[in-house]
């Protein structure tokens, strides 16, 4: 079985980050977190579970602040533990794998394919879950992945596939172009030199709204209970 690691980009995800770690710590061989949170909750979770951790790097004129720069920071923490041929996943705390990535990478034929795109299923609050949500909040047992179970889609596009895993070869290139508005690849998930996507399409759940504070999500949050 091939080694599979994960880099996680997070910011103020206190309600879900420890749940994510508990779920995935035995799924990935090594996990590296880049954190832009205001407090130290995520840092303490990473220390508790032995997760590699770094704060968001400070942007510079040569390396501006965007997703490629952040993922590169987490990737650099992983490099001492990587062997050519390993796979690296790119997820966030509200993205939970349904299929086991260790089994998925073994299904990729040969060495030509260096990217695996994952099928995203969005999960949002449903009126039928309102009572359970309030109960879990009151009891201090809230876990969004146990409360919310309804898939959601927009404009008849029920799902989408995104390149969420790449094969480590040691020659990874991340963009440092500036500024964001002139950088068409700043939001790209995988390194610039990884484009050969395998045909297999595993699935992950995207708990798109796990914090129902209406000041944060408005209609995409608490409002779902009224729809």
Kindly label every feature range from the protein language model.
Residues 29-38, 54-57:
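Short beta-strand/loop segment that forms part of the nucleotide-sugar
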Residues 92-96:
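The conserved acidic donor/metal-binding loop of glycosyltransferases
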Residues 22-30:
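Short, acidic, metal-binding catalytic loop of nucleotide-sugar glycosyltransferases
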Residues 2-22, 37:
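Active-site beta-to-alpha loop of glycosyltransferases that engages the nucleotide-sugar donor
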Residues 64-72, 76, 82, 98-227:
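Catalytic-site signature of metal-activated, phosphate-bearing donor transferases
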Residues 19-23, 44-45, 103-107:
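A short acidic, amphipathic alpha-helical/loop segment
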Residues 42-91:
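Active-site-proximal specificity loops/subdomain of glycosyltransferases
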């Amino acid at each position: 079985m091939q080694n599979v690691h994960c880099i996680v980009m997070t910011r103020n995800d206190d309600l879900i980050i420890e749940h994510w770690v508990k779920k995935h710590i035995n799924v990935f061989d090594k996990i590296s977190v880049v954190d832009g949170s205001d407090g130290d909750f995520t840092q303490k979770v990473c220390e508790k579970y032995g997760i590699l951790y770094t704060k968001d790097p400070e942007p510079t004129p040569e390396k501006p602040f965007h997703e490629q720069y952040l993922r590169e920071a987490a990737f650099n923490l992983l490099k001492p533990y990587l062997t050519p041929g390993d796979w690296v996943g790119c997820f966030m705390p509200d993205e939970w794998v349904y299929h086991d990535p260790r089994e998925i990478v073994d299904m990729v034929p040969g060495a030509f394919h260096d990217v695996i795109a994952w099928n995203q299923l969005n999960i949002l609050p449903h009126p039928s879950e309102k009572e359970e949500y309030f109960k879990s909040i009151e009891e201090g047992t809230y876990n969004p992945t146990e409360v919310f179970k309804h898939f959601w889609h927009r404009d008849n596009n029920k799902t989408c596939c995104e390149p969420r895993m790449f094969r480590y070869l040691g020659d990874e290139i991340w963009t440092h172009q500036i500024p964001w508005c002139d950088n068409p690849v700043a939001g790209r998930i995988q390194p610039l030199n990884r484009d050969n996507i395998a045909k297999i399409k595993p699935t992950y759940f995207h708990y798109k709204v796990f914090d129902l504070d209406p000041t944060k999500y408005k209609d995409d949050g608490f409002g779902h209970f009224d729809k």
